[in-house]
Amino acid sequence: MILEIDNKSMTNRPDLWGHYGIAREFAALAKRPLKPMDVVDLDQYKNLPAIDMKIEDPLCQRYSCLTVENITRNVAPMNMRIRLYYCGMRAINLLADLTNYLMLEMGQPMHAFDYR
């Protein structure tokens, strides 16, 4: 089944911008349980070296970043590229596709850029 939702009227509900937010809303409307999102324990990354960055706008309350090194593959897996295509996005490269995939899943805008 393909379900197309025009989400333009829900701009005051950023929790609905991602697939998980929409699924949570449907689960509530249908009075059905929602499968929890698989979350990786991020404690394994707490000892990574800090990235030198500065938040210049006091209205920005948080900025998260990390570096990814030694990438040997530049193309996203086919299933990810297909899902992006069905969501109206074109595949670009592994890191850009990964951030777009996560944005669609969680509704959290992300961007990958070259640290150099």
Question: Model regions: which residues?
Answer:
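RNA/tRNA-interacting regions in translation and RNA-turnover enzymes
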Residues: 1-116
